[in-house]
């Protein structure tokens, strides 16, 4: 079915749908009875958006694990915060899974420290430890922060799979009993609720990312890097200072967008539809939050690449971190001069979306 007055976006332009199909040798999809109504009145659209959201959110989580390990390598942190015994003391699957993922990623790294080797059998006479005994939460509490996000994404996957294998039509025809059941299987509350939870989870992931960026860029906090990872002339060049403004404002936007749609409902249709799910709105807002998160994470990976070059620790990284560093440097070379970075951010986003670690 393709009416002559229907329009579609094709290659970034609004075009006549029939013309686009003809030019590409495609035939219009022929819908059967009730299929069109199901697409517009059921949960199909919101569920489809939700599944795409889930795919990109899961990839974000894996990248956040990678970034968190690389941050701890840069900071030369103690590795016991990701220890199996420590994280199994909390009976949450997500926390344990994140810690296990971090241990796998950090394997072979010469950057992280073992507390038993550094502190247990040595006499320390200094009154103030130069190296923090317990790093900042954004470095040390990663399993506890990303763990609930892992659990939520697992739950979202279960809900979405249940939904796409469900009948969201109304009424439901049962040929076995020869009954027609009038109900509300079109209602999208499951998807709306799950997309709200997903966007809250991704916002928290983005907040962690932003705090790690702040650690990376704040020389008085990290104590080992120049301000804003500036590899140029201090006082003359800016490093990634301007990019931090983008990361901070984008994270703030995510926080505002995290207000749930699930609890918003405006009656319509002569009050027949007196309480609705707003599920498509929820899914679209979650999509925006995810896109924002990729932008913030892109800036973090740019900063980490600069930091690794400044510290000259390429050969001490874990094999996984070294591979990511080299892949990034293949399209984002080290820089010292002040130039616009929006193209590099876009390239980094494209890399993060295409690669799967």
Please state what every model-predicted region is.
Residues 1:
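Basic, glycine-rich
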Residues 4-357:
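C-terminal auxiliary extensions adjacent to catalytic cores
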